[in-house]
Structures are given as structure tokens and as C-alpha cells.
Regions:
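Charge/polar-rich, low-complexity and marginally structured segments
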Residues: 53-169
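A positional/architectural concept
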Residues: 1-56
Length: 169
């Protein structure tokens, strides 16, 4: 069970604060709900029934500092993701990674997209718009969580990761 005031990552929504746990009657039956407020959209409210295992399983604790350090190290050391040339197949694989919420796979996805972007720039080209959109969603998820763990802004995460990798040598 999660507690009021704690932060979680909720599915593909990203970092949310559990603002309260309260009883609501939406469908004729009163239930307890986690009331989540996304960090990047404080006007939005998400209701998650406390007894709905399929939904509460999408709520994950934020990384610890040790887990974050390991993620950065493991992500940098991981085999590069092979770029799929067929846009439909690539988009499907990228969406599966986003939906999984797997932090290491998200890290590798971002690494692959950033590398591809650099290759395209060198050729005087741009990434497909759908790849840019996937990159933005993945950054929102992963950078949002890292920013929450470190208490920094999401746009400072990339330089933090680079400094950690340089420090490792």
C-alpha cells in the first residue's frame, strides 16, 4: 500500500504524487481510491481504485539513488539497440517499450534515438516526426523520474547523466 504524499511512477503517465486516499462512489459501489496528481500537470487528477490489482501494479516506487546510478551505468554498458528500418515495426517496438515502463529499455531506446538523430543530422536529414514524438514521451517518463529522484528540473537530467558517465571514465 502506498502512502499519501509519496511519489510514484504511474504507467505511461509519469511521476505522480499521491495527494490523498479517499472513498468515492462512482458506480453505485463505494471504493477507496488513490488520488494521483501528475507532477507535470497539477490540474489533472487520476483516480486509481486501491483494490484494482491491474491498475495498482502500474504504480511503482521511484528509483533510489543507488538504483539510479546502476541504471545509468547499465544503460551505458548495454548493447546498443538495433535500429529497425521499417517505420511501422520500429514504431510498434518503441510503443511496447514505452508501455512496459522498463527503465533500462527506456534508457536504451533514448540512446538509440539520440544516436540515430546524430546520424541523420550528419546526413543533413531529420528524424521522422513519430520518432521525435516517441523520444519526447520516453524522456518525459525517464527524465521525469530521474528529476524527481534528484530534485532537479527534467531539462537538467541529460547533463547529469553525461556528468555521471564522464566521472566513470
Amino acid at each position: 500500500m502506498f502512502s499519501v504524499g509519496s511519489y510514484v511512477v504511474y504507467g505511461s503517465q509519469g511521476v505522480c504524487c499521491i495527494s490523498e486516499i479517499r472513498r468515492e462512489d462512482f458506480s453505485g459501489t463505494a471504493k477507496d481510491y488513490y488520488i494521483l496528481t501528475p507532477s507535470d500537470d497539477p490540474k489533472m487528477v487520476i483516480y486509481v481504485p486501491t483494490d484494482a490489482a491491474t491498475l495498482t501494479s502500474q504504480m511503482r516506487q521511484l528509483l533510489s539513488l543507488d538504483e539510479l546510478t546502476a541504471l545509468i551505468h547499465d544503460g551505458a554498458a548495454a548493447e546498443p539497440m538495433e535500429w529497425i528500418n521499417d517505420p511501422r515495426s520500429r514504431n510498434e517496438q518503441f510503443r511496447q517499450i514505452l508501455q512496459s515502463g522498463d527503465r533500462l529499455r527506456l534508457f536504451c531506446l533514448l540512446r538509440a534515438i539520440h544516436e540515430r538523430r546524430e546520424q541523420q543530422i550528419a546526413l543533413g536529414k531529420k528524424l521522422y516526426a513519430v520518432d521525435e514524438a516517441i523520444c519526447q514521451r520516453a524522456e518525459k517518463l525517464l527524465h521525469g523520474e530521474i528529476a524527481a529522484v534528484l530534485n532537479i528540473k527534467p531539462d537538467e537530467v541529460q547533463s547529469y547523466i553525461q556528468s555521471q558517465l564522464l566521472a566513470e571514465g
